[in-house]
Amino acid sequence: MTFTLLPAVDVVDGQAVRLDQGEAGTEKSYGSPIAAALKWQEQGASWLHFVDLDAAFNRGSNHELMAEVVKNLDINVELTGGIRDDASLKRALATGARRVNIGTAALEKPEWIEKVLGEYGDAIAVDIAVRNIDGQWRTRGNGWVSDGGDLWEVLERLDSQGCTRFVVTDVSKDGTLSGPNIDLLRDVSAATDAKVVASGGISTLEDVLELARYEDEGIDSAIIGKALYEGRFTLKEALAAL
């Protein structure tokens, strides 16, 4: 099985944190991001998911720290948070990151994201964060606080623009340890030829194994955050279970 697990390092003001449903102000700190990243590498991670939450919330940047983390690791890193134009994208890629995830700008700048996808191919993934509002899945931007349009319309557009990978988060699940939204992930995967990365809600090894069962449907990886930091299971255990 080639299902990939990406331990997450979310950073606020230079510290590794986790949020509850992505809300600013709900941070719980877990110390040094570099120490966390090295720990996940040691436990066998082949990829790391690194999020600059200050950049995502438009209130600063942890770019130097991101570059330091990438430099100190021998594994693949995907960076996300605040990538909204050519300058921030080039800066992120210059760290040596293997992949850069773009969220808000993919919703708000359709012409720019089409150009970027054409230029950089699978070095770019698109973050699709959603909330169910009155029975309809709506995409979320700007640190998950603004509406970015109907999920299925956004997916159709980005699919036609050449996106090869979507990172899909049900915001109501993120940081809650309440289990992933399998139905949503499968529906998204069925609607696109792109690969889907599951994000949000994983709390048990059973959650990981259930997601991995849908690898042949296009869900080929999962991001794990709070479950690892809270010691629900170790990355080593999760990788061994796969």
Curated annotation (Swiss-Prot):
Main subcellular location of this protein, as a coarse class: cytoplasm
Cellular component aspect of the GO annotation: cytoplasm
Pathway(s) the chain acts in: Amino-acid biosynthesis; L-histidine biosynthesis; L-histidine from 5-phospho-alpha-D-ribose 1-diphosphate: step 4/9
Gene Ontology terms describing biological process: L-histidine biosynthetic process; L-tryptophan biosynthetic process
Enzyme Commission number, as recorded: 5.3.1.16
InterPro entries for the chain: Aldolase_TIM (IPR013785), His_biosynth (IPR006062), HisA/PriA_Actinobacteria (IPR010188), Isoase_HisA-like (IPR044524), Isoase_HisA-like_bact (IPR023016), RibuloseP-bd_barrel (IPR011060)
GO molecular function: 1-(5-phosphoribosyl)-5-[(5-phosphoribosylamino)methylideneamino]imidazole-4-carboxamide isomerase activity; phosphoribosylanthranilate isomerase activity
Active site as annotated: 10
Pfam family, one: His_biosynth
Top-level enzyme category: isomerase
Disulfide bond residue pairs: none
Entry keyword set: Amino-acid biosynthesis, Cytoplasm, Histidine biosynthesis, Isomerase
Catalysed conversion reaction: 1-(5-phospho-beta-D-ribosyl)-5-[(5-phospho-beta-D-ribosylamino)methylideneamino]imidazole-4-carboxamide = 5-[(5-phospho-1-deoxy-D-ribulos-1-ylimino)methylamino]-1-(5-phospho-beta-D-ribosyl)imidazole-4-carboxamide
Gene3D superfamilies assigned: Aldolase class I
Protein's cellular compartments: Cytoplasm
Signal peptide: none
Family from the record: Belongs to the HisA/HisF family.
Full protein name: 1-(5-phosphoribosyl)-5-[(5-phosphoribosylamino)methylideneamino] imidazole-4-carboxamide isomerase
Gene: hisA
